[in-house]
């Protein structure tokens, strides 16, 4: 169908427009690699220490067990269920559990946990579960049942290696398990190790680093030990598996119970049983073979440590804390190939709750509102220290006191005999007015457990460290020991001769170094939430995330114009962002697209709104719409309008800078409103008439509440809908009015001019001369012979009336009069448009039954056919259910009717 002259655009002009738009608003970068290559979601739990509630009873034996460590055993079953529920909600591809699944290797506990894990697999289709044993899990003589009639604990069923395999047969027999380690004849060490290949490109090696068989226990017995070790043949086998996987082009990760890299500088000296023996040698060998990351546990701490070999190969040891001790975390890791790199996003979940459980100690059902806060209260206590102090005293004597064994035994015996009084006084050594030595010890230790060991101590902790360093604390400690255990004169003299000034100084220095080592871990910057580039050329960066004037950094990567940001639950909590507006400022990255992976989007959902700032503008969304599942991509991109949108923009097409907010969640377009800010340079006309409109696929124009402020345009547009910056000079046309889009269309296409520089007078009635002038301009202002109307005169509408009369579009009110200044009625407008359509040789066959309107009888005979056609064509649809044919048509109504006429009849 022939197009009218005012809407024609040449190919050269279009190309120029597209180039200008591209320069103004850069094109959206494709989310490269988003659906290609490795993309694994992994959940990690460790040290679940499950004890069946059926084995718990409030007895002296059970309370003694509770006092021996910090585990939340009574609450444990409910805690484990809650964290498994978190895994269920996350729907990962893989769940890793890095040992100490049970309290003390109770077979009943392994079977219970296996059942829970199998149910989890049913609930999360496709989930692969891989487990490995910890030092508590196999051949543990401490396996006990505390729920007995007489209150005396009895032995529970002890788990043998074969029992472990049987309980977790669904793991060991899984189709993805491609190899198992078989020790040489007569040996058992490492026998629970295996290799799995859950997907193309990734190999996972489960390493049994525990000592429970006579060929690798220090006493040559088949009884568990806390320490970890790998036999030479297990190391060789694991190295072969790593090399074989690399030969296939796989990335290799592992998991085990014991650590491969120290998680604080003094760990090899004071807590070496939490690392495998010869850790440096073995870690180096594995890293050089191609192992990139190992997930560990054992220490009940959240920490990430890295080591790099002389050959330049780096191994990351990601240690996960226990469910049952502060901060009771779960890890959520995503492995994804981005460009040429493999990226690991490590997030920590804590502060879960509420958790309801039966408390066997009180006989009541109780609720934990916040597990992390609850666990923090379960730090070291005097009762617990009474239980473990003997070992600590022995180690201190061995390290600092050079005396005969008999003397050492004498000191040790006296201290143990009076341990309760000593511990009570020692923990209460004052540090400040309201803090004591136990407070400092708990703070330092828990900061390491929680992955918060950044050296940013509260003032009172620093005071405590200073007192340790100066020797003041050790002086008070030894004075307390002397008072309670060596009070007689002779013993006191002997004690002073042993604990000389030099010994005290060495002890102070040692304790201070331990505290600083645990409280200020400098090996890796973030132990809870980290972004690790395991291979490739990408570099980890950071992006500012802010809320209420507080700013923190979130890890990020930039690739191919896309800045992927990794906000976390911990970051959102520390910002206090719940229910508030959050800004993710990626502008410094230079990227035009901001991406957040699924878990990060769920973290952002805690906010009310999220504002993403890219290099070319910002986009603000309601946070709830970002957490529906899947990755979030947002970008302000140049847009190429379709034909209907080109007509809507009309004469402003070459200056409108069409753009679109491309926003998706899991590949699905977001259509919700989005507040946008983008850079814009006004032309010579200035900025006071600038606004923004959104233009639908069919050319529908809607206000975007656009306004120019200090070098930027601000607006609210539907995401994934073309929008444009346009000039609209009429201040009396409300952007919320029903006719706003129609008047914009008319203005953009030169159909109407205003009644003044900034007035349109939308409610003013239209004259006959105005209407004919609009059609004349629509036709391209053709010349015509003079009309017979004597009242058209020499005026702005004269040529339009001449043209309309010459072509039978108007007939006048008499043979010689046109009445150009008379108000055009709705039926006159229908008649004029009907004749114009026939002049254009458009299809005018459509008819509607006007009797449906109560005022149909008031339509003049000459206009009946035209009104029927106009109604059937959707041009005149009535007002409040009536045709009101004799009413004058307002300028706004005429704009709307002409808009419909052009789009419905001409195009």
Where are the model-predicted features located?
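N-terminal active-site segment of His-dependent metallophosphoesterases
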Residues: 30-110
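Active-site environment of divalent metal-dependent phosphoester hydrolases
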Residues: 51-54, 103-105, 135-142, 212-215, ...
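Extended active-site neighborhood of metal-dependent phosphoesterases/phosphodiesterases
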Residues: 112-236, 311, 332
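Proteolytic cleavage junctions
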Residues: 540-558, 563, 652-749
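Proteolytic processing hotspots in large secreted/extracellular or virion-associated proteins
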Residues: 558-691, 695-696
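Feature responds to low-complexity, polar/acidic, surface-exposed segments characteristic
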Residues: 705, 716-741, 748-749, 753-800, ...
